[in-house]
């Protein structure tokens, strides 16, 4: 079970790039060390109260971190997140800049130019050009992270994988399927809330509600004769079964909660506010 969940956590993290709304801790344990990775939402200028909360998650991680890892790629403009990067440039903790997707670069000269632009933007950072797809330079990055870890007793037990409850990853898997099956406006206007999670020895019964902001979005989400929401349910159920290594019974419902991204009571219910 632990091995299955660990593998599932890795899959969720890999597939959820650019879509994380919460601060998620992933824990790596070995006999020699424990690394607590704090994955935060992408940095953006807030348009809703939801995004204000997401920005607070990212800024909170800066305060807590012993090592700051800023992940970008070869196409991102170094001036995209100016205010945030200005703060990163002043950090006293070690900063590692990870430039991903270098497999897309056609020449060494092009890569050197990209690295040079980022070196000027974050002169305090160690730069690691990487390709997660080809696993290039990933081991060197991990080795450097371990070297920078301060001496400390472990924060979590040796069997811990994350600080989030397992039902949290059910919502993440369902949200991923929404992102894959609908145009941008729909998934970014949705929130998933697990209202029932009954785990038995060989099976799990889950009831989840997908919230949207408008009646028109509800119709699009459900689809003609319920075909689209059924497809989402099938895909999500299959991945949840892989995650838990158990038979899963998944029920999905769609509800309208107008302008939920600006309502503090709903943001609190969904875990974005305390």
Tell me what each language-model feature is.
Residues 17-19, 41-44, 74-78, 102-105, ...:
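Conserved nucleotide-binding/hydrolysis micro-motifs of P-loop NTPases
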Residues 56-125:
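Conserved C-terminal guanine-recognition region of P-loop GTPase G domains, centered on the G4
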Residues 11-14, 80, 153-157, 180-191, ...:
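Active-site phosphate-binding and catalytic loops of NTP-dependent enzymes
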Residues 94, 103-162:
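Canonical P-loop GTPase G-domain recognition
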Residues 2-9, 13:
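Single conserved hydrophobic/aromatic residue that forms the stacking wall/gate
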Residues 166-274:
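P-loop NTP-binding site
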Residues 16-47, 62-67:
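Switch I (G2) and immediately adjacent beta-strands of P-loop GTPase domains
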Residues 1, 24, 39, 58, ...:
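Residue-level signature of catalytic and energy-coupling elements of molecular machines
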């Amino acid at each position: 079970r632990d091995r299955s969940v660990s593998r599932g956590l890795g899959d969720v993290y890999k597939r959820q790039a650019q879509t994380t709304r919460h601060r998620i801790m992933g824990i790596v344990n070995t006999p020699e060390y424990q690394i607590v990775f704090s994955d935060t939402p992408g940095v953006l200028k807030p348009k809703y109260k939801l995004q204000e909360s997401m920005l607070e998650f990212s800024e909170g991680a800066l305060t807590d971190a012993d090592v700051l890892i800023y992940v970008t790629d070869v196409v991102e403009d170094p001036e995209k997140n100016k205010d945030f990067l200005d703060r990163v440039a002043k950090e006293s903790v070690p900063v590692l800049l990870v430039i991903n997707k270098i497999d897309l670069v056609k020449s060494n000269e092009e890569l050197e130019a990209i690295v040079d632009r980022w070196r000027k933007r974050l002169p305090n950072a160690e730069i690691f050009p990487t390709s997660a797809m080809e696993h290039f330079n990933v081991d060197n990055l991990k080795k450097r992270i371990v070297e920078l870890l301060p001496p400390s007793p472990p924060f979590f037990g040796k069997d811990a994988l994350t600080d989030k409850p397992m039902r949290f990853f059910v919502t993440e898997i369902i949200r991923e399927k929404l992102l894959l099956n609908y145009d941008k406006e729909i998934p970014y206007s949705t929130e998933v809330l697990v209202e029932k999670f009954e785990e038995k020895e060989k099976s799990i019964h889950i009831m989840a509600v997908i919230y949207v902001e408008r009646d028109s979005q509800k119709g699009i989400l459900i689809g003609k004769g319920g075909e689209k929401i059924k497809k989402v349910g099938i895909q999500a159920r299959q991945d949840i079964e892989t995650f838990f290594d158990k038979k899963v019974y998944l029920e999905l419902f769609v509800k309208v909660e107008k302008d939920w991204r600006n309502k503090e009571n709903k943001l609190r219910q969904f875990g974005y506010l305390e």
